[in-house]
C-alpha cells in the first residue's frame, strides 16, 4: 500500500468529482431495480455488468428486465454487459405436514428419507438427493436452511434410502430449505435441465455476454458446458463459481478451463470453516491475477444496505479489502435487486473502490506480476507488459490499445497499470469517416469485467493505407478520451497498436 497519510484519512468527503473506479461493479437486477428509470440511475452510478439471477423469475420476467436494460443503455449511451447466473444443482429439504414449520430440538434424533413424496414432521424429513445414504457416512455434517440447522450423521441405510441424524441445535425448519454437505463429494450435474433451458431458451437468443455457473466442481464441467453451447461458446464467457470443498480442491484445473471466476462466498462459507473464508478469497484472487483472468468478489458486500442508507463499517472495509486483494469486480446481490437503496449502494461501492485503488502501490504490483510470469513471455504478453512499463516511466495519464478482439487490452489490464486503459475495438475500415458505433459489441462488453479497461466501440474506415487509418482511429480515440476527462491537452498517453505485421508502442502528447 502507498499514498496513505493522516490528512488524506481525515479529509472530509468531497462532492462527486467525476472519477470512475477501475474496479467494475456487477449489479443484480430485481424488483427494486428493473424499471427503465432505476436501471438508468444504476448505469450512471457505475454499474458495468447486469446480473440476471435465474434462481428466481420466469423467462418472460427476465425478458422484460432485459428490454428495460437495453432501453436504459440506449437512453444513457452507457455500455453494460449481461450475465446469466444459473440456479445450478441443489439439494433441498421437502414439504411438511400441513405446510407448517417444524421445531427441531438440540439432541433429538431425526430420520432423513430420500422419498421426496413424504411430508415431513419432527421425526422424519425428506431431502431431494437420492444418493444421500450412499455418499454420507457417520460423523458427516448436514447443514440446512443457510446453516441455521446442523445435523450430525449417526447411521446410513442405502437400501431403505434413509439417514439417521442428531440435531445439534434448537431451530425451526420450514419447507424446501437449502442443504449443504460440507466435505462430501456429491454426484450432481453442473448444468441441470432447467439450466440448459435457461441458457439455450433465453440466454443464447438474447446474445448474453457471460454465464455464471453455480457449483463448478472440476475442469471437465466447463468442457461439458461448452459442448452444450456448441457454436455459441465462442461468444459467451464462462464464469466459474466454486462453492464447495471439491471445487476448492480442483481450483487450478477449473482456472485453466474457465474464462472468468467468481468468489461466491455464500455457499462456500458453509462448506469451509468460516475463519478460512478470507484465505480462500485471497488465494483465488491471487491465482486469477497471475493468469490474467477476471475475478468477481461477491456475497453480502453491502448487505445492510438492503434496509439501511449506510453500510456497516465492516462492509465498507470488506469492499476495500477485496480491491486491495486484486479483485476485478465487486458485486451487489440483494442490495440492488430488492433493497431500499439500489442507486446509493452502487454510488457508495464506487467511492470505496476509488479510495482503495488510490492507496495501492502500483509499482510493487507490476514487479510482482513480472516476477511471477513464466519466461519466455509470449510476444503479445511482452508487448502488454512493456506498454505498462512505458506508462509508469513516462507518467502517462492513459494507455490506449487498438484491438480487434480485445485480447491485447486484457493482457495490458493483467499488469495493473496505475492509469485507465482505453480499449478501442477496431473494425475493418472501408469508408472515409469514423463513427463511434459498432454492429457487434461483444468484444467490448466482454472487457467490462476487467479492472481498469474502458471499452470504446469503433466502426468506420479509411480507404487509405493501414498506417494512415490507424492514425485516424488513434486521433478519434484521444478525442473521446479527452471528452471523458481521462486525459487533457498536454498529457502523455501511451498507445499500443499494430501497423501491418509490426506492433508499435509509442508515447503521444494530447493536443
From Swiss-Prot:
The record marks 241 as: Transition state stabilizer. Pathway: Carbohydrate degradation; glycolysis; pyruvate from D-glyceraldehyde 3-phosphate: step 5/5. One of its GO terms (cellular component) is cytoplasm. Coiled coil: none annotated. It is an enzyme of class 2 (transferase). Its EC number is 2.7.1.40. This is Pyruvate kinase, cytosolic isozyme. Its cofactor is Mg(2+); K(+). K(+) binds at residues 53, 55, 85-86. GO terms for molecular function: ATP binding; kinase activity; magnesium ion binding; potassium ion binding; pyruvate kinase activity. NCBIfam families: PRK05826.1, PRK06354.1, pyruv_kin. It comes from Glycine max (Soybean). Signal peptide: none annotated. Belongs to the pyruvate kinase family. InterPro entries: Pyr_Knase, Pyrv/PenolPyrv_kinase-like_dom, Pyrv_kinase-like_dom_sf, Pyrv_Knase-like_insert_dom_sf, Pyrv_Knase_AS, Pyrv_Knase_brl, Pyrv_Knase_C, Pyrv_Knase_C_sf. Mg(2+) binds at residues 243, 267.
Amino acid at each position: 500500500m502507498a499514498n496513505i497519510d493522516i490528512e488524506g484519512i481525515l479529509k472530509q468527503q468531497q462532492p462527486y468529482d467525476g472519477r470512475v473506479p477501475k474496479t467494475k461493479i456487477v449489479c443484480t437486477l430485481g424488483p427494486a431495480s428493473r424499471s427503465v428509470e432505476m436501471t438508468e440511475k444504476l448505469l450512471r452510478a457505475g454499474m458495468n455488468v447486469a446480473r440476471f439471477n435465474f434462481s428466481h423469475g420466469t423467462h418472460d420476467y427476465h425478458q422484460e428486465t432485459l428490454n428495460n436494460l437495453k432501453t436504459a443503455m440506449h437512453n444513457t449511451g452507457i455500455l453494460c454487459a449481461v450475465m446469466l447466473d444459473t440456479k445450478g444443482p441443489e439439494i433441498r429439504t421437502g414439504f411438511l405436514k400441513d405446510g407448517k414449520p417444524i421445531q427441531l430440538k438440540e439432541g433429538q434424533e431425526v430420520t432423513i428419507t430420500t422419498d421426496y413424496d413424504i411430508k415431513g414432521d419432527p421425526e422424519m424429513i425428506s431431502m431431494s438427493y437420492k444418493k444421500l445414504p450412499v455418499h454420507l457416512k457417520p460423523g458427516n455434517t448436514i447443514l440446512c436452511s443457510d446453516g441455521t440447522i446442523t445435523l450430525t450423521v449417526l447411521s446410513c441405510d442405502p437400501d431403505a434410502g434413509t439417514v439417521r441424524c442428531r440435531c445439534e441445535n434448537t431451530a425451526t425448519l420450514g419447507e424446501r430449505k437449502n442443504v449443504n454437505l460440507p466435505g462430501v463429494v456429491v454426484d450432481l450435474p453442473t448444468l441441470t435441465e432447467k439450466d440448459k433451458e435457461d441458457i439455450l431458451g433465453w440466454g443464447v437468443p438474447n446474445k448474453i455476454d457471460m454465464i455464471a455457473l453455480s457449483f463448478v466442481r472440476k475442469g471437465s464441467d466447463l468442457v461439458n458446458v461448452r459442448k452444450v453451447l456448441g457454436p455459441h461458446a465462442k461468444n459467451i464467457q464462462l464464469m466459474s463459481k466454486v462453492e464447495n470443498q471439491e471445487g476448492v480442491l480442483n481450483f487450478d484445473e477449473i482456472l485453466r478451463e474457465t474464462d472468468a471466476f467468481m468468489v461466491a462466498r455464500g455457499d462456500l462459507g458453509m462448506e469451509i470453516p468460516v475463519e478460512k473464508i478470507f484465505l480462500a478469497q485471497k488465494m483465488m484472487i491471487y491465482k486469477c491475477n497471475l493468469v490474467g483472468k477476471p475475478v468477481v468478489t461477491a456475497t453480502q458486500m453491502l448487505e445492510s444496505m438492503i434496509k439501511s442508507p449506510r453500510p456497516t463499517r465492516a462492509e465498507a472495509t470488506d469492499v476495500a479489502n477485496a480491491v486491495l486483494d486484486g479483485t476485478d469486480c465487486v458485486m451487489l446481490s440483494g442490495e440492488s435487486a430488492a433493497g431500499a437503496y439500489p442507486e446509493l449502494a452502487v454510488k457508495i461501492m464506487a467511492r470505496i473502490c476509488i479510495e482503495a485503488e488510490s492507496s495501492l502501490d502500483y509499482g510493487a504490483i507490476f514487479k510482482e506480476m513480472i516476477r511471477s510470469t513464466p519466461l519466455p513471455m509470449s510476444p503479445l504478453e511482452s508487448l502488454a507488459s512493456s506498454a505498462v512499463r512505458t506508462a509508469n516511466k513516462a507518467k502517462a495519464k492513459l494507455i490506449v490499445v487498438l484491438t480487434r478482439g480485445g485480447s491485447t487490452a486484457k493482457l495490458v489490464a493483467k499488469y495493473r497499470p496505475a492509469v485507465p486503459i482505453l480499449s478501442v475495438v477496431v473494425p475493418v475500415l472501408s469508408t472515409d469517416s469514423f463513427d463511434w458505433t459498432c454492429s457487434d459489441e461483444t468484444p467490448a462488453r466482454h472487457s467490462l469485467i476487467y479492472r481498469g479497461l474502458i471499452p470504446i466501440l469503433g466502426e468506420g474506415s479509411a480507404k487509405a493505407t493501414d498506417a494512415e487509418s490507424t492514425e485516424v482511429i488513434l486521433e478519434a480515440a484521444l478525442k473521446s478520451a479527452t471528452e471523458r476527462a481521462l486525459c487533457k491537452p498536454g498529457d502523455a498517453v501511451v498507445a499500443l497498436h499494430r501497423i501491418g505485421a509490426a506492433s508499435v508502442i509509442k508515447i503521444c502528447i494530447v493536443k
